[in-house]
């Protein structure tokens, strides 16, 4: 009988703990849903503001969720285009950011955009989206379907876009780094952008790194700032995190 009482008491304690755990899980789930709705609302607002800035309807822009550049990141890009007034832009990873840049710089015949993409199908898709929207409209634009090849940097070997045959400008005013894809097997996938293109960066150049809250991008930023101490970093509180690098 004593053993039965002990078992019943133990079961009761377990049930109480499970009830408490269930309440905590419900609270966490509600919090996640709340912040998910907040972020979604903010991004919808940013998308509308961006569309207004570009002078287009909201539906003119391709989808800006999932893997695509988020509206808040694209708003940062638009602000930097106004600030830097770039002649030459290079971006790593084509897509909605390419369309945004082409629209922002439309009609400026002295401007050039070079966009890398490791996947030829993605590059072609971006080209088709641009054509549907009547872009680049006078601005020079190259979408380079550049496969990943080995680059040796400081004795280390990295996979990054093939640059041979790509018409890179001698002076880059704005460098957008939103590719290659970072994975657990290649956390520093975006690191080569700065060491490989550093000598082409103009005096007024600005570097923008998307997804800067992730561990891989954080590791990339750490190495960049250690290896290139003449640069300083500003973190912008976008949904995925944006890092802006400028010369000191």
Task: Explain the meaning of each model-derived region.
Residues 85-95:
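Conserved class I S-adenosyl-L-methionine
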Residues 50-84:
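Class I SAM-dependent methyltransferase Rossmann-like catalytic core
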Residues 127-170:
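S-adenosyl-L-methionine
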Residues 1-54, 181:
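Heptad-repeat coiled-coil amphipathic alpha-helices that mediate oligomerization/assembly
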Residues 110-117:
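Conserved SAM-binding motif I beta-strand of class I
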Residues 181-248:
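C-terminal substrate-binding/active-site "lid" region of AdoMet-derived donor-dependent transferases
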Residues 169-179:
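Short SAM/SAH-binding signature in class I
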Residues 96-108:
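Conserved SAM-binding loop of SAM-dependent methyltransferases across substrates and taxa
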């Amino acid at each position: 009988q004593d053993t039965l009482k002990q078992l019943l008491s133990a079961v009761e304690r377990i049930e109480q703990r499970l009830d408490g755990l269930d309440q905590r899980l419900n609270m966490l789930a509600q919090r996640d849903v709340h912040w998910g709705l907040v972020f979604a609302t903010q991004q919808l607002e940013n998308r509308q503001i961006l569309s207004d800035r570009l002078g287009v309807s909201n539906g003119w822009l391709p989808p800006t969720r999932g893997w695509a550049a988020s509206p808040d990141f694209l708003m940062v890009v638009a602000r930097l285009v106004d600030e830097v007034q770039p002649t030459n832009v290079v971006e790593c990873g084509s897509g909605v950011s390419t369309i945004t840049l082409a629209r922002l710089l439309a009609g400026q015949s002295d401007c050039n955009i070079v966009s890398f993409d490791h996947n030829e199908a993605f590059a072609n898709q971006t080209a088709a989206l641009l054509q549907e929207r009547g872009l680049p409209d006078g601005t020079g634009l190259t979408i380079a379907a550049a496969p990943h090849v080995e680059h040796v940097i400081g004795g280390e070997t990295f996979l990054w876009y093939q640059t041979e045959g790509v018409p890179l400008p001698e002076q880059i005013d704005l460098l957008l780094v939103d590719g290659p894809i970072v994975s657990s097997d290649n956390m520093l996938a975006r690191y080569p952008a700065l060491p490989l293109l550093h000598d082409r960066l103009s005096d007024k150049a600005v570097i923008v790194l998307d997804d800067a809250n992730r561990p891989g991008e954080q590791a990339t930023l750490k190495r960049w700032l250690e290896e290139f101490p003449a640069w300083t970093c500003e973190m912008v509180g976008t949904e995925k995190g944006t890092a802006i690098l400028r010369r000191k």
